């Protein structure tokens, strides 16, 4: 009597037990068992969720020699001034400020391939080689306080519409009793002669302003003043033209005796 082998589909049995040369059950079981939770990968620098510092704004400010950066806060004004040979980094909430003196940038540009051991120069190279999307470069121009005050005062004087600039003649430059009916004066940003100057209203701030130079180029068409005792001289008579005061011609004299004898001979 011959027995037929059982169908594998009717009675499922592990086939690795019937194959003598197959892999062991332990290895197969380890390959087929459900995998456990994978370890969480460490956040990379490109992952914005893993590194919250990427969202912060970073500004690089280049300061000239002897200048400082004023940052207005809620209650006070913060003045930041780095040392001439160092770089200052300040974090204000989500904003990071990096202050670089202009001297360090000029020293980095002048290296031209020469090697030096300055740590400040290396730090400048690191900041300048940062990613452009994460760094906002801001160039800051500063000046000393007296220069700024002088410039503001000059701007206020130039932009004051209530007190237009007028150039009046000096009393010593004109003749007594005569006044010019048309005058040409030097006025910046204005061309052509101007009418007679009018009196200005008293200005309380005019005392502090320095007197400005007055330039009179020429006087033309001098006319006499009716109330002045000085009157212009009459025009001089022209030579060769008879005028009302010209002398009458002399009567002809008879020729002398010698002259009569000469013509009679």
UniProtKB/Swiss-Prot annotation:
Q: What are the Pro residues biased-composition ranges?
A: 226-237
Entries under InterPro entries matching the protein: PRR23
- Output compositional bias ranges, type Low complexity: 1-18
Basic residues biased stretches: 256-265
- A UniProt-annotated Pfam family: DUF2476
Region Disordered: start-end pairs: 1-49, 226-265
- Give the family this protein belongs to, as stated in its UniProt record: Belongs to the PRR23 family.
Q: What is this protein called?
A: Proline-rich protein 23B
Lineage in the entry? Eukaryota, Metazoa, Chordata, Craniata, Vertebrata
Q: Report which gene this protein is encoded by.
A: PRR23B
């Amino acid at each position: 009597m011959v027995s037929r082998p059982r169908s594998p589909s009717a009675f499922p049995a592990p086939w690795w037990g019937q194959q003598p040369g197959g892999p062991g059950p332990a290895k197969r079981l380890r390959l087929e068992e459900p995998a456990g939770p994978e370890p969480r990968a460490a956040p990379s620098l490109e992952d914005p969720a893993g590194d919250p510092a990427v969202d912060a704004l970073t500004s690089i400010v280049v300061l000239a020699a002897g200048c400082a950066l004023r940052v207005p806060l809620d209650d006070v004004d913060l003045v930041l001034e780095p040392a001439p040979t160092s770089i200052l980094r300040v974090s204000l909430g989500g904003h990071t400020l990096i202050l670089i003196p202009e001297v360090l940038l000029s020293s980095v540009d002048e290296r031209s391939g020469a090697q030096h051991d300055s740590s400040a120069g290396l730090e400048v190279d690191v900041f300048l080689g940062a990613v452009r999307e994460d760094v906002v470069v801001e160039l800051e121009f500063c000046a000393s306080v007296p220069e700024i005050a002088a410039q503001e005062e000059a701007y206020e004087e130039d932009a004051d519409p209530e007190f237009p600039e007028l150039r009046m003649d000096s009393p010593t430059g004109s003749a007594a009793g005569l006044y010019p009916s048309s005058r040409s004066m030097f006025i910046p940003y204005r061309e052509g002669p101007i009418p007679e100057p009018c009196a200005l209203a008293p200005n309380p701030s005019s005392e502090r302003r320095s007197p400005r130079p007055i330039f009179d180029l020429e006087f033309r068409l001098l006319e006499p003043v009716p109330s002045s005792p000085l009157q212009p001289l009459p025009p001089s008579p022209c030579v060769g033209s008879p005028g009302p005061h010209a002398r009458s011609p002399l009567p002809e004299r008879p020729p002398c005796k010698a002259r009569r004898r000469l013509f009679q001979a």
